[in-house]
Amino acid sequence: MKELTMLSLSFFFVSALLAAAANPLLSAADSAPNPVLDIDGEKLRTGTNYYIVPVLRDHGGGLTVSATTPNGTFVCPPRVVQTRKEVDHDRPLAFFPENPKEDVVRVSTDLNINFSAFMPCRWTSSTVWRLDKYDESTGQYFVTIGGVKGNPGPETISSWFKIEEFCGSGFYKLVFCPTVCGSCKVKCGDVGIYIDQKGRRRLALSDKPFAFEFNKTVYF
C-alpha cells in the first residue's frame, strides 16, 4: 500500500513538472504582477493614451505642464502640474514598461510616463517624465519632463516610475523607486501634490500620495 502511495505521489510530481515545462508562458503569466485597469475594468495597454482622473472630488483635475515659476520666470523643461478645475482632464499620458515586449501595463513595474501630442519648449523635445534634483528653495523633489524613454540603467534612473494599487479596487498612485539599476541609490517616495505660493498644484515626492483612476482618451 505504501509503495502504491509513493508511486502515485511520484507520478503526480512528475506530471506537474512536465506540465510546467510545457507551459512556460502560463507559469510566467501566473507570477506576473496584476495589470493596471481603467475605469471600465479594461487593462491599460502600452503606448495607449489615458487621462489620469483624481479620486477625490474638488481637489483639482487632470495633469498638464507649467513652464513658469511662481515669480513668473520661464523654465524649461516645464514642471508637471495638476489643473485646478475638476472638469479639466487636460493632457493624455502614455505608459511604456521597462520590457518593450510587454503590451500590458502592470503594477509594481518600472515604466516611463510621457505626455502625448505635446511640444514642451524649443530646448527639449522630450515629454517623458523625470524626477528633478532636490529643490533647496522648497525642500521638494519635483516631477518635470525632459526624461529619457527606454535604455534602463544609471543614466536614465530619474525617468522610471511605478504604478501601485491604492485604497481600493481601481484606485492607483504613482511611486518613484526605480529598480532598473541595482547599484544606484535613489530617493524613493510616493508622488503627491505640492501647492506653491501661487496656488499651482505641482507633482512632487510626498508622504500623501495623489490617488487617481485611469480614463481612456477618446478622439472625435
Curated annotation (Swiss-Prot):
Self-association state and partner proteins as the record states: Homotetramer; dimer of homodimer.
Species in which this protein is naturally found: Synsepalum dulcificum
CDD domains: beta-trefoil_STI_VvMLP-like
PANTHER family for the chain: KUNITZ TRYPSIN INHIBITOR 2 (PTHR33107), KUNITZ TRYPSIN INHIBITOR 5 (PTHR33107:SF5)
Record key words, sorted: Disulfide bond, Glycoprotein, Signal, Taste-modifying protein
Protein name, entry field: Miraculin
Family: Belongs to the protease inhibitor I3 (leguminous Kunitz-type inhibitor) family.
Entry PTM: Glycosylated; contains as much as 13,9% of sugars (glucosamine, mannose, galactose, xylose, and fucose).
GO MF: endopeptidase inhibitor activity
Signal sequence, start to end: 1-29
Gene3D superfamilies hit by this protein: 2.80.10.50
Cystine pairings recorded for this chain: C76-C121, C177-C188, C181-C184
Function: Miraculin has the property of modifying a sour taste into a sweet taste. This alteration of taste perception persists for many minutes.
Tissues of expression: Expressed in fruit pulp after pollination. Not expressed in seeds, stems or leaves.
Residues glycosylated per entry: N71, N215
Pfam family, one: Kunitz_legume
